[in-house]
Swiss-Prot record, chains A, B, C:
Keywords: DNA replication, DNA-binding. It comes from Natronomonas pharaonis (strain ATCC 35678 / DSM 2160 / CIP 103997 / JCM 8858 / NBRC 14720 / NCIMB 2260 / Gabara). The keyword Metal-binding does not apply. This is DNA polymerase sliding clamp. It holds the Pfam family PCNA_C. One of its GO terms (molecular function) is DNA binding.
Length: 247, 247, 247
C-alpha cells in the first residue's frame, strides 16, 4: 500500500536528482519516507535520495519496493503548475501507479524491481577535507572546466586554507580558488582527486544554484556531495569515483 | 479590388489557425469580410475561418478569390511589433499582394487559386453533445495524451454529466474527467469518438489558452471545435474526422 | 607587457563585432588602446575595431601584437555576469593570456600572429552618400530581405532624398524607403550598390539595435558602416565589397 500527496515541485526535484544518473530506479517505501539509491551503468556515479514523510502533504504506506521509469514520471510531474499537488496511489494487484493532478489521471506501469540494476552501497569513507559551498560556485567551476577539458581536479590546500578546482586542456587551463571568505565553511586537510567532468556536469544539473552543498574530499578518493531540498525534508548524496591521475 | 488595414495580431492569429493544417489556401474576399476554408491533404482535418470586415481598421473589396502561400505571409506579418498595423493592397493585374508595415513593403506573388486543393464542404452534422471548455484544458488533455499514445478518445458520459478524455498506450494510460464545475457549459448526450492525436495537436497550437472553445461530439462522428478571436470579429471552426475504433 | 581591467560587457561587445567575420585575429596593443583589423577569408567583409584605453578600468601596455582565438575568449567573457570586471594579464614568456573574473582564472594559449591572415588596409573611399540610421532599421531591412533573396541593394535617391533597400527574389520582392524623417541624418548623392546578404546579416548581428550607424554608400562601391559602443570609447567600422549587378 502506498498513497501520498506531494507538491509537484518537491517530487520533481527529487526525481531530477536521480534521473541525471539513471533512467530506471527502485523506490523504497517505508513509514519514514521514500528512498532511492542508484548507480550509473559504469559504476562511477552514485546517488542516495531521501524524501521524508514530512515532505508530503499526506503519506501512507505499509512498505515495499517499486520500479519506476524516471523519464515517464518526470514528464507527468512536469505537467503540473508550480505549487500544484500530485496524488500518488499504488495499485498492488496490477502493479500500476495512479498519478493524478488537477483532474488528470495517469496510470503508470511499474517495472519489475528485480529487472533493475542492484542498489549500490555507499561506502562510509573517512575523507580528510570538508567544504561547504554554494551550488552556484560548483556550476561556475564545472562550466569553466568544460571549456578546456573533460576532467577536473578538486582539491584543498590546507596551508593556504583554500578549496581549488583545476582543469587542464591541451592548450588552455582553468583554475578557481575559493578561500574561507568565498566558502560557507571549510575543514581543510590534504586532498586532491581527479574526476570525469561528464558525471560532475550531470550532478551539477540537479544541484540548486542556491543550495548549500557539503563536499567531502580526499587524496585520490571519491568525492561526496550532499545537499537538502524541500526545506530540509529532502536530502541528496552524490558520490563520484575518482579517475586515475595521468601524471 | 482589395485594400485593407488590419492589426498584425489579428491577421497573425487568423493565418495561424489555417497554417496548422495546410501550406497554401484560397482566401475568399467579399464585403462582409474574408473567409478561408481548407482541408489537409489526407482529408482528415478541416478549417473554416471567418474574419469579418469589422476586424479591420479599414476594408474595401469588390470580391474575389486569391491563392496564398501561408508560410510567406506569416513570416512577413511576424516581422511586425504587437499592435502594429499591416496594409494589404491587391494588384489585380500582376496578381501580387502588396503588404506594407511601418515603411517596409513586401510584394507577395499570389498562387493561382485553381492550383490549390478544392475547398471542402463542412457537413452540417447533428451531434449529440456540446461542451464549452477553456483552451487551456484542451492543451492539458492533448499534452498528457501525447505522452502515451498517438490517438485520443473524446467522450461524454450523460449520466455522470462529464466530458472525458482517454488515451491508451502500450503500458500507460491517461484519463481526464471534467464535470459541469470544470467546464464552462455542457449539453450532455451519448458521445465517444477516437481521433488522431497529430491533428488535434496541430489544431491545439492555434487555439488560444484563454479561448472559450465550443466542442460538438457524437458517437463515432467527427468533432467540431469553434472559437472566436479578435474580440469576436474572427471565428474559427475546426472539424476532425474520427479514426475507426480498434476494439 | 599588457595588463588591463575591463567590464565584461565592453570586452564582449568588442569581440562580437570581430567574431562575426573571423575566428582568429591579431590584437594590436599600444598606449592609446587596442585595435583589431580583420578580413574574412573571401576578402569581402572587413572590420576595424578600436577600443581606447579610456574604455578600460585600468590599462597598461608597452605595445605589441597578440594572436587570439575569438571563440575561446568570447566563451570565457560570456561566463561573467553583466557589469562584472575581467582582468587580463599577458605572460610574454609563455605567450599565454591570463584572464580572471570573480576568482576564476583562465589561461588562454595565444596564437602565433604570423600564422593569422594579414590585416587588411581599409581603403579611404570617397563615397557620395552618407546615411545615419538606427541599428534597429538595419535589422528590419536585413530580416525582410532575407525572406526573399540572398542579396540586397542599398541606395539613395537624391531627388526624393530617400535611402532605400531593395531585395528581389524569384517571386517576391522587398522594398524599404526611409526619408529624412525616418533617418537620423542624410547627406544624399547618387548611390546604389548590391551586396551579399550573408555578410550583412553577420555584421547586423554585432550592431546594437539602439546604435546610431553611419553608412557611406556609392555607385557600385563598397559600403562602410561605423558605430560607437562602450559610451563612445569603442568604435567599429565595417566595410563590405559590392557584388556585381546582374542586370
Amino acid at each position: 500500500m502506498f498513497k501520498a500527496i506531494v507538491s509537484a515541485d518537491t517530487l520533481g526535484a527529487a526525481l531530477d536528482s536521480v534521473s541525471v544518473l539513471v533512467d530506471e530506479c527502485k523506490v523504497r517505501l517505508d513509514e519514514e519516507g521514500l528512498t532511492i539509491r542508484a548507480v550509473d551503468p559504469a559504476n562511477v556515479g552514485m546517488v542516495d535520495l531521501e524524501l521524508s514523510a514530512s515532505a508530503f502533504e499526506s503519506y501512507e504506506t505499509d512498505g515495499g519496493v517499486i520500479g519506476v521509469n524516471l523519464d515517464r514520471l518526470e514528464d507527468i510531474v512536469g505537467m503540473a503548475d508550480s505549487g500544484q499537488l500530485v496524488h500518488l496511489d499504488l495499485d498492488e494487484e496490477t502493479r500500476k501507479l495512479h498519478i493524478s493532478l488537477d483532474g488528470l489521471e495517469y496510470t503508470l506501469a511499474l517495472i519489475d524491481p528485480d529487472s533493475i540494476r542492484q542498489e549500490p552501497d555507499l561506502p562510509d569513507l573517512d575523507l580528510s577535507s570538508e567544504i561547504v559551498i554554494e551550488g552556484a560556485d560548483i556550476d561556475r567551476a564545472v562550466t569553466a572546466a568544460d571549456m578546456v577539458s573533460d576532467h577536473i581536479a578538486l582539491g584543498v590546500d590546507p596551508d593556504a586554507e583554500e578549496f581549488y578546482v583545476d582543469a587542464e586542456g591541451d592548450t588552455d587551463d582553468v583554475h578557481l580558488e575559493l578561500d574561507r571568505e568565498d566558502l560557507i565553511d571549510l575543514t581543510p586537510g590534504e586532498a586532491r582527486s581527479l574526476f570525469s567532468l561528464d558525471y560532475l556536469k550531470d550532478m551539477n544539473k540537479a544541484i540548486p544554484k542556491d543550495a548549500e552543498v557539503t563536499m567531502e574530499l580526499g587524496e585520490e578518493f571519491p568525492v561526496k556531495m550532499h545537499f537538502d531540498f524541500a526545506e530540509g525534508d529532502g536530502h541528496v548524496t552524490y558520490m563520484l569515483a575518482p579517475r586515475i591521475q595521468s601524471d
